[in-house]
Amino acid sequence: MSWQTYVDDHLMCDIEGHEGHRLTAAAIVGHDGSVWAQSATFPQFKPEEMNGIMTDSNEPGHLAPTGLHLGGTKYMVIQGEAGAVIRGKKGSGGITIKKTGQALVCGIYEEPVTPGQCNMVVERLGDYLLEQGL
């Protein structure tokens, strides 16, 4: 299965039980900042934005004072799981990033999708990739 298929079929799919509700954008990005696959709507990001996310995954709390920036959008960092999940909020939307052994699984949402639904979609794929040694 291609990385693009993971994005299209597992991240940008309808949310279980909520037909028509899906993430706004999603991507799988290597720890080095290279994009493995992304939705057409995923923002163009700067290398320093991805570096900040990687630093926070290794040093939890790094982004809390400045916020998480992706594609020029600033998200307020909210509770996550140290070294595993970073969550951010902006207005009625937000972002979830799950770190695996080799990649970052990223999902961006807006209402009517809820933070919990975004977390479920992103973390489910991230957990699967971890189980596969990725």
Swiss-Prot record:
<dbReference type="InterPro" id="IPR027310">
    <property type="entry name" value="Profilin_CS"/>
</dbReference>
<dbReference type="GO" id="GO:0005938">
    <property type="term" value="C:cell cortex"/>
</dbReference>
<keyword id="KW-0206">Cytoskeleton</keyword>
<dbReference type="GO" id="GO:0005856">
    <property type="term" value="C:cytoskeleton"/>
</dbReference>
<keyword id="KW-0009">Actin-binding</keyword>
<dbReference type="InterPro" id="IPR048278">
    <property type="entry name" value="PFN"/>
</dbReference>
<keyword id="KW-1015">Disulfide bond</keyword>
<feature type="disulfide bond">
    <location>
        <begin position="13"/>
        <end position="118"/>
    </location>
</feature>
<dbReference type="InterPro" id="IPR036140">
    <property type="entry name" value="PFN_sf"/>
</dbReference>
<keyword id="KW-0020">Allergen</keyword>
<feature type="modified residue" description="Phosphothreonine">
    <location>
        <position position="114"/>
    </location>
</feature>
<feature type="short sequence motif" description="Involved in PIP2 interaction">
    <location>
        <begin position="84"/>
        <end position="100"/>
    </location>
</feature>
<keyword id="KW-0597">Phosphoprotein</keyword>
<protein>
    <recommendedName>
        <fullName>Profilin-3</fullName>
    </recommendedName>
</protein>
<dbReference type="GO" id="GO:0003785">
    <property type="term" value="F:actin monomer binding"/>
</dbReference>
<dbReference type="InterPro" id="IPR005455">
    <property type="entry name" value="PFN_euk"/>
</dbReference>
<comment type="subunit">
    <text>Occurs in many kinds of cells as a complex with monomeric actin in a 1:1 ratio.</text>
</comment>
<comment type="similarity">
    <text>Belongs to the profilin family.</text>
</comment>
<keyword id="KW-0963">Cytoplasm</keyword>
<dbReference type="Pfam" id="PF00235">
    <property type="entry name" value="Profilin"/>
</dbReference>
<comment type="function">
    <text>Binds to actin and affects the structure of the cytoskeleton. At high concentrations, profilin prevents the polymerization of actin, whereas it enhances it at low concentrations.</text>
</comment>
